[in-house]
A protein has these predicted regions:
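Positively charged, small/polar-rich N-terminal and surface patches that mediate targeting and assembly
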Residues: 1-105
Length: 105
């Protein structure tokens, strides 16, 4: 496997904690889709932050869901990111396209 996708799932809507049912539902949807398409995923909880229009630094819990792949499917990954963006009313959702060297032993 030479590449991986990472979709960053935020946990807020307009600086307010999002309902867990929405966040957890999106996490399950993304993980299920990546597992089906690429055989598996890794999820990591982290802290993300951004500067609000007011100038305030906003920090929130985020979930990074990563899947390694040999055959790309940008359309799937971008549609998942769009779903996250829409359901959590985000201006944008970050997707990493990473080169890596990995194998199963």
């Amino acid at each position: 496997m030479n590449h991986s996708y990472v979709i960053v799932i935020p946990s807020t809507i307009y600086n307010v904690p999002a309902p867990l049912t929405i966040v957890d539902g999106l996490r399950v949807a993304v993980k299920s889709a990546l597992a089906k398409a690429f055989g598996g995923y890794t999820e990591t909880m982290a802290t993300g932050g951004y500067k609000a229009e007011s100038g305030e630094l906003i920090e929130e819990r985020v979930y990074l869901v990563e899947a390694a792949y040999e055959v790309e499917d940008d359309e799937l990954v971008e549609s998942l990111a769009l779903q996250v963006k829409q359901e959590l009313h985000q201006e944008s959702v970050m997707v990493y396209y990473k080169d890596l060297r990995a194998r199963f032993i």
